[in-house]
Amino acid sequence: QRPLSASWTVTGSGAFLVGKKKSRVRISGVTIGKIVDYGLKDSQNMGACMAPAACDTILQNLMDFGRGEKDYDRIITGDLGYVGQSILFDLLRKKGLDIKENHMDCGMTIFDQQTQHTNSGGSGCGCAAITLAAYIMPQLISGEWKRILFVPTGALMSTVSFNEGESVPGIAHGIVLEHC
């Protein structure tokens, strides 16, 4: 039986063109993340492994741009899932931030947990890509959302590192997208 912390791989892809022509959505800032390793070794709980990196990137973005969490319509993580989201909230709360009102996680959005029984939610790079393409970008294009912080998350592991019992570090980069 799969643990409740396990996630389901999302099969999908997304591609975006970045150019000089004026568009209805622009990239107005980027925060390069760093590898964060809390020493967790459970590959069935990648949300917990990635949450510290997401926390670090969100905090760094807010500091770099002189913003607060309310300056974004949404702060969107890639695939932390239900378990990782809870850890992210705890880590941010310890730093004095509360993003519960405007946080969204692609791994939690992509599936219906009640009817599809997906444990912690969806995972994988396709999860963030298709949610950005099919759900987030239309919100920005229409102007329903004016500014978001998109923080896709990643777990750095391989079959070799797993078999050797290594920890699973996380990484997350931040992209500020704005309606224009």
Label the model's feature ranges.
Residues 80-95, 160-167:
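Short glycine/threonine-rich loop-to-helix capping motif typified by GTGT followed
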Residues 13, 50-57, 68-71, 84-88, ...:
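General structural feature for long, well-ordered alpha-helical segments within catalytic domains
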Residues 1-59, 64-67, 101-108, 147-153, ...:
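Condensing-enzyme catalytic core mediating Claisen C-C bond formation in acyl metabolism
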Residues 128-129, 134-164:
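Internal helix-turn-beta structural module
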